[in-house]
C-alpha cells in the first residue's frame, strides 16, 4: 500500500510510529519525505507519542540526513537525531520525533543488561553524539513543490557509489 494514501484515510492516533521507507531516489518516493507526508504523520501521533524515522547515512549523505530532520521540524515536531553502525550499511542515521521535548535514555533498562549484542551501556550515550563531520548543516525543507531531497540524495550518494 501507499503510505501517503493510507495516512490520508486513517483517523487513528498512535503512541509509536516507526517509519522505514525506501530511499528517496525518485519523486514518487521523495513525496514520502515531504512536509505533506510528515504533517499527516504528525496528526496521527499521540500527544506523548514518539515517531522514529530511518533516514540515511549522516556521514555519506549529511545534507540529506539533516534535510529530513529539518522537514520534520517544519511540521512542528521536536527532532532528536541518533546514529548507529549497521553492518550492511555503515554508520546510519535515525530521527526520534515528538510533540514534546525528548530526553534520550542515559542507561539501559536493568532487564536488558547483558542480553543485547550491540547495544551496551557504553554504546548507548554515543548514539546521540555526532562527530564534527556528521553534525548539523544548513538544509532546506523538503516540500512537494520543491523535492530538494531527491536531488540532494542523488548528488551525495553519487559521490560515494561507483556507477
Question: Language-model segments: which ranges?
Answer:
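Soluble small-group transferase modules, centered on the S-adenosyl donor enzyme superfamily
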Residues: 4, 9, 78-163
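The AdoMet/dcAdoMet-binding core of the Class I SAM-like
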Residues: 1-69, 73-75, 81, 88-90
Amino acid at each position: 500500500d501507499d503510505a501517503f494514501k493510507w495516512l490520508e484515510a486513517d483517523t487513528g492516533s498512535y503512541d509509536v510510529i516507526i517509519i522505514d521507507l525506501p530511499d528517496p531516489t525518485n519523486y514518487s518516493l521523495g513525496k514520502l519525505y515531504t512536509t505533506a507526508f510528515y504533517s499527516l504523520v504528525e496528526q496521527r501521533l499521540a500527544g506523548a507519542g514518539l515517531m522514529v524515522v530511518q533516514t540515511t547515512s549522516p556521514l555519506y549523505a549529511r545534507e540529506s540526513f539533516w534535510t529530513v530532520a529539518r522537514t520534520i521540524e517544519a511540521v512542528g515536531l521536536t527532532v532528536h537525531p541518533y546514529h548507529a553502525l549497521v553492518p550492511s550499511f555503515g554508520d546510519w542515521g535515525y530521527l526520534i520525533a515528538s510533540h514534546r521535548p525528548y530526553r534520550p535514555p542515559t542507561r539501559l533498562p536493568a532487564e536488558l543488561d547483558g542480553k543485547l549484542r550491540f547495544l551496551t551501556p557504553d554504546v548507548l550515550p554515543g548514539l546521540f553524539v555526532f562527530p564534527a563531520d556528521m553534525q548539523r548543516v544548513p538544509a532546506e525543507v523538503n516540500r512537494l513543490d520543491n523535492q530538494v531531497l531527491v536531488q540532494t540524495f542523488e548528488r551525495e550518494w553519487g559521490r560515494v557509489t561507483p556507477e
